[in-house]
Amino acid sequence: MFEGILPAIITPFYRDSRASLDIEGLQSNIESLLQRGVHGIVPCGSTGESATLTFEEHEQVIGKAVEVVDGRVPVLAGTGSNNTEEAVRLTRSAKDAGADGALIISPYYNKPNRSGLIKHFTKLADLDIPIVLYNVPGRTGQNLQPDLVAELARHPNIVGIKEASGDITQISRIIEETRDEEFSVISGDDAMTLPVLAVGGAGVISVAANVDPGRMVGMYEAFRAGDLARAQVLHYELAPLMRAMFIDTNPIPVKKAVELLGMAAGPVRLPLDELDEAKTEQLRKVLVNHG
């Protein structure tokens, strides 16, 4: 269900005192991505600043994404929380809005034990919406181990994982352990897209695709067509851009890049702060060289 290039979209804000939601800009950005051939849309993830969106803003962003996409590609909505009941509320709302699936980050800060993780993810999967797990140890302080993922994958509604550990050995093991299930392993790091595809992964939930969806889609489609040489060329063309997306905390650089390209972006919300002048110039040079 979820494969290919799926941009983790930014949430554009106005440059007003509240950094209020720019729904028209959101609509424009999504339509632009769809016109460039992306295979899915992922609102309200880390890149979409979900941590600083209110519940009502989550509803607005996901609802608008579903409306604009209009069935052309899947919408995978970020609905995770370290509060299980809040995650249930967000996930139920996304389902009611028409999202095709829910992206559920591993609970952060409170570091649940194994049985707590199983109960948390199972409670969400029992809402009868396809669930994609999200493993990002650098943000959560906890790594979803391959054997745990394999156990969760036996639930019929747990259909994949966004894997952002950066560990190709672990990613390969998850693919190996879930081969008997209808389960997609999706890279959570742009730079790992081609390696993950090579070991049997399904695609990437991408930051860089906000900036250059065309080349990201081209790399994926070249690989799927068996043209590894072309996929490698595009991988290395994209590499400087991929690195530039992490010269500061995500999504600070990608929002600035999108703004520099003339699309809707606006500020990041506190406690994140905007890119400083030196890094902005560094990013500008990468964009100019990228072409």
Swiss-Prot record:
A Pfam family annotated for this UniProt entry: DHDPS
Catalytic activity: L-aspartate 4-semialdehyde + pyruvate = (2S,4S)-4-hydroxy-2,3,4,5-tetrahydrodipicolinate + H2O + H(+)
Keyword Ligase: no
Gene3D superfamilies listed in its UniProt record: Aldolase class I
GO MF term set: 2-dehydro-3-deoxy-phosphogluconate aldolase activity; 4-hydroxy-tetrahydrodipicolinate synthase activity
Main localization category: cytoplasm
Binding residues annotated for pyruvate, in chain numbering: 47, 205
Keyword entries, A-Z: Amino-acid biosynthesis, Cytoplasm, Diaminopimelate biosynthesis, Lyase, Lysine biosynthesis, Schiff base
Active-site residues annotated for this sequence: 134 (proton donor/acceptor), 162 (schiff-base intermediate with substrate)
Superkingdom of the organism of origin: Archaea
Enzyme class of the recorded protein, top EC level: lyase
Listed GO biological process terms: diaminopimelate biosynthetic process; lysine biosynthetic process via diaminopimelate
EC number: 4.3.3.7
Annotated localization: Cytoplasm
Subunit structure comment from the entry: Homotetramer; dimer of dimers.
Family indicated by similarity: Belongs to the DapA family.
Function comment: Catalyzes the condensation of (S)-aspartate-beta-semialdehyde [(S)-ASA] and pyruvate to 4-hydroxy-tetrahydrodipicolinate (HTPA).
PANTHER family per the UniProt record, alphabetical: 4-HYDROXY-2-OXOGLUTARATE ALDOLASE, MITOCHONDRIAL, DIHYDRODIPICOLINATE SYNTHASE
UniProt protein name: 4-hydroxy-tetrahydrodipicolinate synthase
Taxonomic classification: Archaea, Methanobacteriati, Methanobacteriota, Stenosarchaea group, Methanomicrobia
Gene name of this polypeptide: dapA
